[in-house]
Each structure stands twice: as structure tokens, then as C-alpha cells.
Amino acid sequence: MRKQFTAIIASAIALVTLVARAQVGAIDPNRPHNDHDYEHEHEKKQKYTCLMHPEVITDHPGNCPKCGMTLMPIKESKRSTPNAQRPTSNKSHLSHPSHSSRASVVASAKEDPSHEMHQHGMEMHSSVDLADPMTREGSGTSWLPDSSPMYGRMFMFDGDMLMLHGAIFPRYTNVSTRRGDDRIDAPNWIMAMYSHALGDSTRIGARLMMSLDPLTETGRGYPLLFQSGESWHDQPLHDRQHPHDLLDELSLSLSQKFDHDLSAYIYFGYPGEPALGPPTFMHRPSAMDDPDAPLGHHWQDSTHVTFGVATAGFAWKNVKVEGSIFTGREPDEDRYDFDRPRFDSYSGRLSWNPTRNLALQVSYGYIKSPEALEPDLKRHRTTASVIYNLPLGHYSNWSNTFVWGQNHDTGEGKTQSFLIESNYQRGRDTVYVRWERVEKSGHELVLNPPDESRIFPVSGYTLGYVRDLTHGNGLDIGLGTQFTINNRPDTLDRYYGDDLGYAFQFFLRIRPSLHSHGSRQHGEHVAGIEK
């Protein structure tokens, strides 16, 4: 217990330290600039500036010498009142920019450069496909709604972009029934996204995702009633969520934009994520405050850590078609090594974002031999999902996800999974819910031989609440709790007992604050407005 507790503390310190150290030598696009620039900019009638670096001012159009962005003209805005005052660097102005109080585009860019990028039709780009806005980028090559919030820290290095984000949940969790358990642990992950422009229409990207789960969770993982998948000491795990590998993504991508509406990309990951399923649960805004994995993880998004992935796709406007070849085998029990790439499976996905607030996808995949204990197993997976995100104002957001996943395994037939998640944030307070129903075989639940071939519908109902203790100052630390009720058929009582299945936990949620380029910081993202 002492080693585990030490690992939890070390994980939290590592997350905080990495975010802090990355600021050294970087240009933070959210950093306020000197007020004397404001006076200088208004002495000239026509100048050009960089929205990320307002101190760059020229008398001709072109590209920013620091980051390579297209320079924008400084335009004088009309004041709505004669008493409008010059903008300041006060945080209240940063949080609630007023159009009537802005004296110029540059002055407001100093308050919130990302706001002006939207005002002029400019956006920060995805590291996978330069035609996509950064807010659309989910796990792997998946799409989120364009209005999704981004929690992370962005830095610019001479035109290159680096984004850091992640989360850690130091907690106490307690699960009932004979198969339950209680423990102190800390699910966690941290990710870096980097992109470099090779010209106006070509970009390369790289991503690194890591987790200290092997230290904080150990090989058995954490207790989670009715969860299944993977193994420990050559025995199948049941009623526990397996830990993730130390290295969960190491990927490179190359994207090309052919015109305003058409682009294409290639993506290679070792490990990486194929074009199969919705964005992985920890990357969905609707699940970002829930420390637990969904019970349908191995029906919906379990391929997010795959040792050997190659994906190609093209996007036209808000529609994307992509296909992958990848390794079907899930990670082995050694969470610190690189597994052998096989490229023996394939998948395809169709994604469509009809509005800024909606992301839809359908996908199919053939997965060969996903489990080491069942080398002859062949799995056909089909998924569909709808993600709806609604910004409600400054630091207020409502995100929802529906996922359906179906596995068709050799010798077992088809089993279904359904999930609904919702996350409502208002200021420092967040309330979230998750409902799911999954059909699992007795073999999956590791029951006795007479029940192995039977299918059992199991479900979970979760309600959680988080209150931020620190908020919006670079690192959000929230104190949270959640309660889950699990339902099962009476025929499972011989394994779980007669008691009600439930779980509760108390946790800290530690993550970077909302990035100012996130959708909730922009004036056009008011309640009910879509673009």
C-alpha cells in the first residue's frame, strides 16, 4: 500500500511539473502583452499584426516571423459609447471580452488572441489534419464536435505548436458484492500533441500519450463491477478494469490540404488507434470527470491502444472517410514493452459533423485474435455514436454522448452494448451521469462452465459531482464523488451474492485549465447558437 500511495503522489507531481516546465522557452498565446503596444498601434492607420503575437507589427501583409501565421490587418472598430475605456489585462476583461470596449482588433487580440482568430475566420489546426480545427480532434483520428472545450496548455515555438493535456484521479473506491473490492489508486494519463507546417497546405504531426497506470493500478487494475477484458498472470480479468500501458500512443501523421473543402492524411501509430469506434472515453468531454472506464469499453473503443496502426483518410467539408490496417491483439500483460506488430486486422469509419455542436460516426472492424488467451477468436465489431456539445457561456458547457457497439465473436454470436453519458459544467461545479447496458457472456464474466455460453445483460447507473478547488489558473483541481448502482439478472446471484451491486468513490480530479481557444471563450458560442 505504501508503494502504491507513493506512486499516486509521484504521478500527480509529474503531471503538474510537466505542464509547468513546458512553459520555459515557449511563447504562451494566452500571455498578456504590454499596454504601451496599444498606443503605438493606434498611431498608424493601416498596419498588419499576428493574432498570436500582437507585438509583431508591419506595414505590409505577409507571415509572422515568429509563428508563420498570416498577418491580419488592424481595423478600427466603432465605439458604442464615448466613455469606452482602453482594454486592460485584468482577468475580468479576459474572461468577458466586450465588443463595445474594444478600440481595435489588435487591442482585443491582446486580451484573447484566440477570440480574434474566430472573428477573422482563423482557427488553430488539428495535429492530424490541418483542414480540421483543433477542437475537432479526438483520440486517434476520430472527431469531436467543433464546439468542444479543450483543457490543456498550448505553446508556440517558431511556428510549431505544442499542446499538453491529461488528467489524474487520486481516489478511494469501494465496490460491493462478493466480487467487489476497495482500494486507493489513481487512474491517469498525459498527452503531448505537436505539429509543424511544411508549407501553406502541408503539415506533419506527432503525438505521445503515456500513463502511469502500471504503477498506480498494478497488473490487476482497479475494481469495477461487471468489467471484463484482458488478463493477469494468464488468467482472464473480471470485475476489474485493466491498467493501460506506460506508452499508449506514439504516432506520426502527414496531412495535405488540396483546396478549401478537400484534404487527406496518413497516420501511423506504434502504438496508436485505428479508425474504429467513437473517441476513446477519456478524450470525450462527456466522460472527462468520470474516473472509471465504461463497462462496454471492449465493445466500443478498446482498440485505442494498438501496437501497429496505419490509417489513411480524406475529408470533404464536414464528412470524412477513413480506413485502417492494424494489429488485432490487445496489449499483453507486460505494460512497459512494445508488442509485436501484426497488421492482421482492418477497419473503416465514416464521420460527419453536420453542425458545430454535433459529431456522428459509424464504423466497422475485423479484429483477429484480440485476446491472448483465445488465439483463435475472430471478432467483427460495429459501432455508431452521436456526440452533442452545447456551450452555454463562459465556463459553462453541456456535453452528451450516445454509443452503440456490437461484437460478433466466433462461437458466441452477437452481443450488444449501449451507453449514454452527460456532463454539465457551470463555473466550478460539474454534475455528470452515465447509463450503460451490456450483454456479456458467462465466458466473458468468468463464470462456471455450465453458464459460460449464456448471455447476461448487465447495467450500471452512475451519478457524480465535482467541485473545483482551483479553477482557471492553469491547473484545475476538483474534489469529487460518484455513486454507481449495478443491475444484474437473478441468475448471477450465485456468483455475486444477494446484495445490491453498488460502488462509491471519493477523488481529486487534477487537469490543466480550459484553454482560451476552447469554444466557451468565444463570443459567438452563446447558448443555442450553431454555425
Give the predicted meaning of each segment.
Residues D160, D182-I190, H244-L250, H304-A310, ...:
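Residues that define the transmembrane beta-barrel architecture of outer-membrane proteins
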Residues Q23, R102-K110:
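Short Gly/Ser/Thr- and charged-rich N-terminal loops/segments
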Residues D498-K531:
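Outer-membrane beta-barrel "beta-signal"
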Residues E217-S351:
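Surface-exposed coil loops of outer-membrane beta-barrel proteins
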Residues L162, D200-I204, H260-A264, N318-E322, ...:
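Repeated loop/turn-to-beta-strand initiation elements of outer-membrane beta-barrel proteins
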Residues L164-G166, I204-L208, I266-F268, A312, ...:
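Membrane-embedded beta-strand positions of outer-membrane beta-barrel proteins
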